[in-house]
From Swiss-Prot:
Pathway: Amine and polyamine degradation; betaine degradation; sarcosine from betaine: step 2/2. This is Dimethylglycine dehydrogenase, mitochondrial. One of its GO terms (cellular component) is mitochondrion. The gene is Dmgdh. Residues 1-43 form a transit peptide. GO terms for molecular function: dimethylglycine dehydrogenase activity. It comes from Mus musculus (Mouse). Its cofactor is FAD. GO terms for biological process: amino-acid betaine catabolic process; choline catabolic process.
């Protein structure tokens, strides 16, 4: 056992930095005079918060040439969570884009000491994640294929290599390790001071103590930032206030979904076996034991993540606010909470049993509901940006500072990072939900990360569709931006449990039945989570012509349109319907609702357009009806003529279905004959029941989003967030049909796209068939050719029509021809894949056109690379 001297620390309110270098006192003494006495009454950017993230942003903005960067800290730099952090740094992240953030952070930290002259205390002994179960080995294989097409070094290593790198381990249960060279740890205090020195070197002003007391927006989009020392007029503000971020948000009426969590770690005295080592131990992560462990001088530092039942939220701070003056304080330690993890660590690293504990640190870190930070501009409040919710702020700080700086300076994100968008949360994100999800996220820190993962705490939210009660007992629901939406349906006798897997699991056969339901008969899907906006006004047409690369649809018609960034990348995909002259209905995906709305609102403000923009997402439900018998079923319920001649593809009309008012758009993401029916949310259940009743003779049935994904892939329909995002341009994504470079309007990104077209493409999106066994592509897997990684998948599914896996992938142009053979890496094995002519299955409108022209309509022979709907 750890020696009982540790227990004497229980009940003590520990004070002071647990790891501050002996020279830190001198540096800290030099810090106050370094805070300049001058005051600026104007600033380009005011950053609120002097933790590692805020100081990093100040450094990056100033270094990039922005004048008048002002950082305001309420007490002193590093106060809050930075000063007591364990300081871990890693290239690894399961999220694709966050790997770039981690990479940028580490590369900055490697050069920062030379650049600023400040010691940062950066150690890079590498890190090892331990697999002690077969499913964990599968997870490592899954993560390898998602990493191979990145710059990050990462390897699966055998037990012998693990023992060589970390000779103090008990190897009895270890099956494999995931090894990242270059990982390690850094002193958070020294890092922040180095960033501060760099920020000042490049002209930023760092003021502290300078608590912000008031934020006042002005009509021109600027802000008055008030402090006891005076007021500053700022073109933008960035809330980087850590666990004070909620208080800052409340100054302007925002309730950020953040909550402080108590996180403990233990520091031991010198351990002879550690001291005797000739090199520093790599950072260790025992995932089943749910803890990290690293060398601290000649001892060890051990940090666990307790279960959600044992962990402790600082919920009182959400209710009553952070105690005044709290800055470099800690909570009372509680070793009982982490005793199970200590025992697991002592079994894995036996030398811990005879170690003395010299310090227990229990400090606050801030969690968002999904554990990811909130980074970017906030919808509904102009020029208000956030960089908060960092559960892992030290490794995120450098990269996020660079990311935000680039976005602020260039008007668009440097790469896609939608998972950190603060606008992924909305009014549905209550305090109760935030608490439940933060507790779950903390407790799930080290669980196996499966594809199609679902987490159930805090559900359902208040944001359920009108069909939730009707459908919940017969389907597996998925969570989408607060909504519950059916993923797949089950029938009596089928396995209904949530069984995540890296291979095909219990939903595979039911989804196949739903696929056949739509292809052979008629299916109904709840699409209520769609984001829905109404735009009208004198300048509505001009605004949309400026925003979208496609032409504006005629009255009574719909088209698919894309908003591009100034650099010609795909910011969003929406359907645009002109309901009446100058009045438009815009539809986007559930996950991009406020993301897209903010972009539209900002363009309207900047251009001075006279428009009215309404978010009607929660007011309306949507039912999708699709399949060869869709028209026959719906025609029973309305006097409106639904024939091809009367109701054309992409046409929109408003009429009644069984006395229920609907706006119907003839479009379906399945690619089959279908309509989307927009209606009052309170009418959803009645409309659904009447459609299902009318379709009994046709064998009508439900289908969910898993079947929808299989259907859209066969039709070669792209998905925003997968095939297209801020990392892609529409030409390489095969979206030429929807981009009208010859239209008169100078839409955002037009000139950049012309330049891209002139220079030629370097890569292209292709469709692949993959000869697999019991595993299917999910997206972001590596594409191999002649022993080298040449690209990546973007999404995938099983094709129930040809009984093979299907995937979209980006590959070099020279490897993009139909018939080209490549390989797709899945769970550590490379499977043969072939580029096919897309679409695999023709859409219903395309089949109808060919039939009208008297041509053969082989469902599995698409005529061209680009599918015209």
């Amino acid at each position: 056992m750890l020696r009982p001297g540790a227990l004497r620390l229980r009940g003590l309110a520990l004070r002071g930095s647990p790891r501050r270098p002996s020279s830190a006192g001198l540096r800290e003494g030099q810090e106050s005079p370094a805070s300049p006495p001058e005051w600026k009454d104007r600033a380009e950017t005011v950053i609120i918060g002097g933790g590692c993230v805020g100081v990093s942003l100040a450094y990056h903005l100033a270094k990039a040439g922005m004048r008048d960067v002002v950082l305001m800290e309420k007490s002193e730099l590093t106060a809050g969570s930075t000063w007591h952090a364990a300081g871990l740094t890693t290239y690894f992240h399961p999220g694709i884009n966050l790997k770039k953030i981690h990479y940028d952070s580490i590369k900055l930290y490697e050069r920062l000491e030379e650049e600023t002259g400040q010691v940062v205390g950066f150690h890079q002994p590498g890190s090892i994640r331990l697999a002690t179960t077969p499913v964990r080995v599968d997870e490592f294989k899954y993560q390898m294929t998602r990493t191979n097409w990145h710059a990050t070094e990462q390897y699966i290593i055998e037990p012998e290599k693990i023992h060589e790198l970390f000779p103090l381990l008990n190897m009895n249960k270890i099956l494999a390790g995931l090894y990242n060279p270059g990982d390690g740890h850094i002193d958070p205090y020294s890092l922040t001071m180095a960033l501060a020195a760099g920020a000042r070197k490049y002209g930023a002003l760092l003021k502290y103590p300078a608590p912000v007391t008031s934020l006042k927006p002005r009509p021109d989009g600027t802000w008055d930032v008030e402090t006891p020392q005076g007021s500053v007029r700022a073109n933008r503000i960035v809330n980087a206030a850590g666990f004070w971020a909620r208080e800052v948000g409340k100054m302007i009426g925002l309730d950020h979904p953040l909550i402080p969590v108590q996180h403990q770690y233990v520091v031991t005295s010198t351990i002879p076996e550690v001291k005797a080592l000739k090199r520093e131990l790599p950072v260790l992560r025992d995932l089943e034991g749910s803890y990290y462990l690293r060398q601290e001088r000649d001892g060890l530092l051990f940090g666990p993540y307790e279960s959600q039942e044992k962990m402790k939220l600082q919920a009182s701070w959400v209710t009553h606010g952070v105690p005044p003056g709290f800055g470099k304080e800690l909570f009372e330690s509680d070793l009982d909470r982490i005793s199970d993890h200590l025992e697991a660590a002592m079994e894995m690293i036996p030398v811990l049993k005879k170690a003395d504990i010299i310090n227990v640190v229990n400090g606050p870190i801030t969690y968002s509901p999904d554990i990811l930070p909130m980074v970017g501009p906030h919808q509904g409040v102009r020029n208000y940006w956030v960089a908060t919710g960092f559960g892992y702020g030290i490794i995120h700080a450098g990269g996020v500072g660079k990311f935000l700086s680039d976005w602020i300076l260039h008007g668009e994100p440097p790469f896609d990072l939608i998972e950190l968008d603060p606008n992924r949360y909305g009014k549905w994100t209550t305090t109760q939900y935030t608490e439940a999800k933060a507790r779950e996220s903390y407790g799930f820190n080290n669980i196996v990360g499966y594809p199609k993962e679902e987490r159930f705490a805090g559900r359902p939210t208040q944001r359920v569709s009108g069909l939730y009660k009707t459908l919940k007992s017969k389907c597996s629901m998925g969570f989408h931006a607060g909504w519950e939406q059916p993923h797949w349906f089950y029938k009596p006798g089928q396995d209904t449990q949530y069984r995540p897997s890296f291979r095909r699991t219990n939903w595979f056969e039911p989804v196949g039945s739903e696929y056949k339901q739509v292809m052979q008969r008629v299916g109904v899907i709840d699409l209520s989570p769609f984001g829905k906006f109404n735009i009208k006004g004198r300048d509505s047409t001009q605004l949309l012509d400026h925003l979208f690369a496609n032409v504006i649809p005629k009255v009574g018609f719909t088209n698919i349109s894309h908003m591009l960034t100034p650099r010609g990348r795909v910011y969003a995909e929406l359907t645009v319907s002109q309901q009446s002259p100058g009045e438009f209905l815009l539809i986007t995906g559930s996950g991009s609702e406020l993301h897209d709305l903010r972009w539209i609102e900002e363009a309207a403000f900047r251009g001075g357009y006279d428009v009215e923009i309404q978010n009607i997402t929660d007011e309306f439900g949507v039912l999708g009806v699709a399949g060869p018998y869709a028209r026959r079923v719906l025609q029973k319920l309305t006097s409106e003529d639904l024939s091809d001649d009367a109701f054309k593809f992409l046409q929109t009309k408003s009429f009644n279905i069984s006395d229920i008012p609907v706006t119907a758009i003839r479009i379906s993401y399945t690619g089959e004959l279908g309509w989307e029916l927009y209606h009052r949310r309170e009418d959803s259940a009645t409309l659904y029941e009447r459609i299902m009743s009318a379709g009994q003779e046709e064998g009508i049935g439900d289908f969910g989003t898993y079947a929808l994904n299989a259907l859209r892939l066969e039709k070669a329909f792209r998905a925003w967030g997968s095939e297209m995002n801020c990392d892609t341009n529409p030409l390489e994504a095969g979206l030429e049909y929807f981009v009208k470079l010859n239209k008169p309007a100078d839409f955002i990104g037009k000139q950049a796209l012309k330049q891209i077209k002139t220079e030629g493409l370097k890569r292209r999106l292709v469709c692949l068939t993959v000869a697999t066994d019991d595993v299917d592509p999910e997206g972001n897997e590596s594409i191999w050719y002649k022993g080298k990684v040449v690209g990546n998948t973007t999404s995938g599914s099983y094709s129930y029509s040809i009984q093979k896996s299907l995937a979209f992938a980006y590959v070099p142009v020279q490897l993009s021809e139909v018939g080209q053979q490549v390989e797709v890496e899945l769970l550590g094995k490379n499977y043969p894949a072939t580029i096919i002519q897309e679409p695999l299955v023709l859409t219903e409108p395309a089949r109808a056109r060919l039939q009208k022209d008297g041509k053969k309509t082989n469902l599995e022979k698409g005529p061209s690379r680009t599918t015209k709907l």
